[in-house]
Structures are given as structure tokens and as C-alpha cells.
């Protein structure tokens, strides 16, 4: 519901043109910034360790990887950014009708070979998109922070107001107003205090998004109503998210990375480029 409201407010021109978005999460709440454990542990009888390893190179079992902490290890997860951006950046991607970023750069605390860093920031640049009837879609910068790093507080936000809602937030800076929503697009509001009355143009999901997906799966393909986040949207969106992860892992190149989305390649990394990690 929150994602729907964010989209409809932006598309109705309620906050004007958006040229910058700041986002953050309070994650990781699992260990990151770790070296590989040296101790080999007995595999639990209830676990298929080979299935867990999947396509990653084999390593001995250690309780540091499971059941919750896998997401912090590069072989099994994508860290706080990959874990939470799919929830926090969804209203950004959908509301601003984003596609492939053209430029991306990342930085972090100490970057290790084995696990994601303890804190990181990423900057994406997206080109202008087709204008909508009530609002233009100019080039926009999207900034991501995690691990305790935070964006600046928006001007006009009351002192003491906590930006963090359910694990993070997105801050849309428009030419008319500033829109803020929590993780999952939750509880959107305008810094001005005004409550928009935008027309409803997106289908309301009366049940959970999980069951909406099940419904779409069960419907006949000829007259199926697409789910709230169809693969045609979710696929490119997640490509954007892991592009941020890649920017952090390639920060040792010391350059802004230029991305050719349709051909899935960077255009400005020399063939002999080298990066260093610990």
C-alpha cells in the first residue's frame, strides 16, 4: 500500500521533479566484515551441507554461516545492500520509473575477500526518463547508506523525528516538497505536512503480496492480471540492486564505473585493471 501511494503521489506531481533520493537501512544486524573461520565443525544431521554450498567453491561447515548469517558472506549472500535494498529501493525504482543506471560508485569500511563490509555507501546515476503527464523525470542520483551510515536530515524535518521506519527509509527530494517513506514503502508522508489527494491509478492489493503472486500463477495466461511486482519489474530492479554491490566490490579501481545496461558490461574498465582486497 505504501509503495502504491508513493508512486501515485510522485506521478501526480505532488512533490515536483525528483533529482536526488537518499536511502538507508539499519542493517546489517548480522556479522559482516569477517575473515573466513579457521575451525571445521561437524555438520548437523539435519543439514544437507552440499546443497547449502550450491555452486560456491566447497568449504568446511562452520556455524558462522547458518542459519541466519549466510547473507553476510560473499559466497552465499550480498550483504546489507543486497539483502535490504530490494525492500527499501522498490518505491524508488517503481515511483521514478528507473531502468539501468549509467554510472555507479561505492565505498565502504575495510573490504574483505570473504564477507561484505561492515558499512558502505553507493551512488547510482540514472538518465532522464520519458516525462509523465503531470511531472518530468529528469536525471536522478540515488544514494544508499548502511551499517550505521546515514544521509543528512532533510530540511524542515522536526527535531527528534526518527527517519528509520521498520529498518530504513527513502527520502525523495522534489522541487515542490520532500517525500519520506519507511522500509517496504511504509507510512509515506510529506515533510511539509500536507496530505496529498492523488487519484488512484494502481491496483490495490487487498491480500498479501505473496498471495497476490500465487493468484497470478494460478490464473490462465490469456487473461492473467499481473502480480504487484511482476518479473518484468522485479528482474531489472534486482539487477540495479546488485549493481550497487558490484560497485562496492570494485571500489579498488578508484573510478566512477560506467554501465552499459542493455549489453550488461562496464565500458570504462581497462583490461589490465587490478583491485586489492584483504
Model-derived features: positions:
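Glycine-enriched catalytic-core subsegment of oxygenase/oxidase enzymes
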Residues: 84, 89, 96, 100-278
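Flexible glycine/proline-enriched surface loops and loop-helix/loop-strand junctions
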Residues: 33-36, 68-78
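A contiguous active-site-proximal alpha/beta segment in oxidoreductase catalytic domains
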Residues: 1-48
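Substrate-binding clefts and catalytic carboxylate motifs of secreted carbohydrate-active enzymes
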Residues: 79, 90
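Active-site-proximal cap/loop segments of hydrolase catalytic domains
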Residues: 3, 26, 58, 66-69, ...
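Short, solvent-exposed loop/turn elements at domain surfaces
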Residues: 30-32, 60-62, 151-154, 181
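Residues that line or immediately flank small-molecule/substrate-binding pockets and catalytic motifs
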Residues: 22-25, 56, 108
Amino acid at each position: 500500500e505504501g509503495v502504491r501511494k508513493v508512486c501515485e503521489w510522485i506521478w501526480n506531481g505532488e512533490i515536483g521533479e525528483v533529482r536526488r533520493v537518499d536511502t538507508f537501512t539499519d542493517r546489517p544486524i548480522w556479522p559482516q566484515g569477517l575473515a573466513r573461520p579457521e575451525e571445521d565443525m561437524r555438520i548437523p544431521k539435519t543439514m544437507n551441507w552440499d546443497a547449502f554450498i550450491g555452486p560456491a567453491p566447497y568449504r568446511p561447515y562452520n556455524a558462522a554461516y547458518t542459519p541466519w548469517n549466510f547473507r553476510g558472506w560473499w559466497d552465499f549472500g550480498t550483504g546489507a545492500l543486497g539483502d535490504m535494498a530490494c525492500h527499501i529501493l522498490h518505491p524508488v525504482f517503481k515511483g521514478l520509473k528507473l531502468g539501468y543506471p549509467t554510472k555507479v560508485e561505492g565505498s565502504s569500511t575495510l573490504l574483505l575477500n570473504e564477507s561484505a563490509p561492515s558499512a558502505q555507501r553507493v551512488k547510482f546515476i540514472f538518465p532522464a526518463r520519458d516525462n509523465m503527464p503531470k511531472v518530468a523525470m529528469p536525471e536522478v542520483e540515488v544514494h544508499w547508506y548502511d551499517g550505521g551510515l546515514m544521509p543528512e536530515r532533510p530540511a524542515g524535518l522536526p527535531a527528534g523525528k526518527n527517519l528509520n521506519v521498520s529498518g530504513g527509509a527513502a527520502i525523495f527530494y522534489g522541487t515542490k516538497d520532500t517525500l519520506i517513506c519507511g522500509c517496504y514503502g511504509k507510512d509515506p508522508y510529506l515533510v511539509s505536512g500536507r496530505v496529498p489527494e492523488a487519484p488512484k491509478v494502481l491496483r490495490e492489493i487487498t491480500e498479501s503480496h505473496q498471495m497476490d503472486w500465487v493468484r497470478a500463477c494460478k490464473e490462465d495466461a490469456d487473461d492473467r492480471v499481473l502480480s504487484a511486482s511482476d518479473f518484468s519489474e522485479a528482474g531489472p530492479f534486482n539487477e540495479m540492486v546488485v549493481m550497487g554491490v558490484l560497485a562496492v566490490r570494485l571500489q579498488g579501481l578508484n573510478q566512477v564505473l560506467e554501465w552499459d545496461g542493455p549489453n550488461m558490461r562496464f565500458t570504462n574498465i581497462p583490461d589490465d585493471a587490478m583491485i586489492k582486497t584483504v
